[in-house]
Amino acid sequence: MPVRQLPETIVNRIAAGEVVERPASVVKELVENAIDAGACRVDVFSDGGGRRKIVIADDGGGMTQADLALAVDRHATSKLDDEDLLAIRTLGFRGEALPSIGAVARLSLTTRHAAEPHAWTLSVEGGAKSPISPAALSQGTRVEVADLFFATPARLKFLKTDRTEAEAIREVVRRLAMARPDIAFTLAGEERAPVTWAAALPGAPGRLTRLGDILGADFRANAIEVGSEREGVAVEGFAASPSLTRANALGQYLFVNGRPVRDKLILGAVRAAYADYLPRDRHPVVALFVTLDSREVDANVHPAKTEVRFRNAGLVRALIVHALKEGLAREGRRTAANSAGAAISNFRPASMPPGNWDWRSSPSYPVGGGSSAAPSFGERPQAAFDVGGPSADIRPHEAAPELLDRPLGAARTQIHETYIVSQTRDGLIVVDQHAAHERIVYERLKASLDANGVQRQILLIPDIVEMDEATVERLVARAEELSKFGLVVESFGPGAVAVRETPSLLGKVNAASLLRDLAEHMAEWDEALPLERRLMHVAATMACHGSVRAGRVLKPEEMNALLREMEATPNSGQCNHGRPTYVELTLADIEKLFGRR
């Protein structure tokens, strides 16, 4: 077959295949046009998942009759000058949306410019334009798209159900509404009640209002404001506390110069910032806005304009990580307290069992007098915590007056040999002793690694740990990384490892259990995992093994010492796996449980 020039209608339909993938693509392009036109309000309607009908109406600047005639021609745009391709300041810029939509659907445009005496309307059906005629419209532009893909019926079979396509439209509008809280949006159709997001006030409060309206009250209650700026690049937005997570990354909303994007660089930076707070199977919820000179970012790298390329990607990543880490560290104590709200809703009034209860047969520690199986308060604690602080040797009744004003209060008791209950001026706090100490040890290991290295203790008799040859090879291959944390191992034949030194911070540790856990984690590591992340995984595993275990009875001075160390430790609100280390119940919360409020 000889080479020949394709007809214009076929060319437009091929081009439309890149721009118009599904109904949500149409909505995205048309709403972006409305935003670029200076609209203060955008109304979106869809029916049949967008296949049967899509209507976008705005109160923007509109178009003149002459502009309307050009608007449906390919590569005709008012948003780009000859030299502006590397300095794009609008959401749209290629001039492909309207002609692409008109090539595969029945398109109707009605618009009115302030300089025109009345509105004008134009129709395009399968690429064929109708003459422009007068119309009635008070302001802005109204675009109707009907029978999407009627001109390319083969595309219809690749669409999902109406419900799925409608949800994709909803997600597109949500993202654009988050990007522009100063614009009012209405989403209607699909046999659902209309949703309206009113225009918000400028600045962070208005942005949080819009994000809360879209992402829900949970996000608003757990939102932490973050921000960082350097060398002309600014990162701002809101990140949810580690107590609010999702099973996937769909709750991460990223915007560059007001454009919603899905950028692997930014997603990786978010994951890195939360690495010390979340388990690997949970994902944070964030809304981040990156602002920089338009010449420092290329938005023309994807047909749907959902990806960007940064000139200085390293700077952008560093700013995002810094902003998130700083915000999470600043609000660390508050994030743990938020976990109590959900627990309160699960409380139910208790009922006594039938019959008479003999309190004398109850196996509890006496309040005063008598004997007890608990350790004597006068004994010195074991070396699990640093008890050299001023509160270490203070009896509970003596410590209360001054310790009640401390953030984590004064220890009152231990329940189930696992949880510490402390009293504050305004309520009580329940601490998971293992999770809390695990975070303390983890932060100490990191600090030692950043300073002069982790101090080691030499074993007089090396521990010989037997395991399969593959596991031995895996551990020996990472011996240099393990030694950075004071764990010195070497091969001891084909099926064993000799442990010669262990970290001093861990005290007496079960080397066999620690090595097996480390080997299991190493088996899951991707070879591309950065060294820093591998080291943090090692530190987290060591911290878990070096922490006080659930089931150990603690003395009052040990409990108070742990509380004081938590107050002095960054990120102490969560353990290394992302779970809260403590929950706080205010006096008001307690009164609610008993119907006093």
From Swiss-Prot:
Q: What is this protein called?
A: DNA mismatch repair protein MutL
Pfam family, any one: DNA_mis_repair
Q: Taxonomically, what lineage is the organism?
A: Bacteria, Pseudomonadati, Pseudomonadota, Alphaproteobacteria, Hyphomicrobiales
User: Keywords assigned by UniProt?
Assistant: DNA damage, DNA repair
What highest taxon heads this organism's lineage?
Bacteria
**Which species expresses this protein natively?**
Rhodopseudomonas palustris (strain BisB5)
Q: Which family does it belong to?
A: Belongs to the DNA mismatch repair MutL/HexB family.
> A GO molecular-function term, please?
ATP binding
What is one process in the GO biological process aspect for this record? mismatch repair
Per the record, GO CC terms?
mismatch repair complex
What the protein does comes down to:
This protein is involved in the repair of mismatches in DNA. It is required for dam-dependent methyl-directed DNA mismatch repair. May act as a 'molecular matchmaker', a protein that promotes the formation of a stable complex between two or more DNA-binding proteins in an ATP-dependent manner without itself being part of a final effector complex.
Q: Does the keyword Chloroplast apply?
A: no
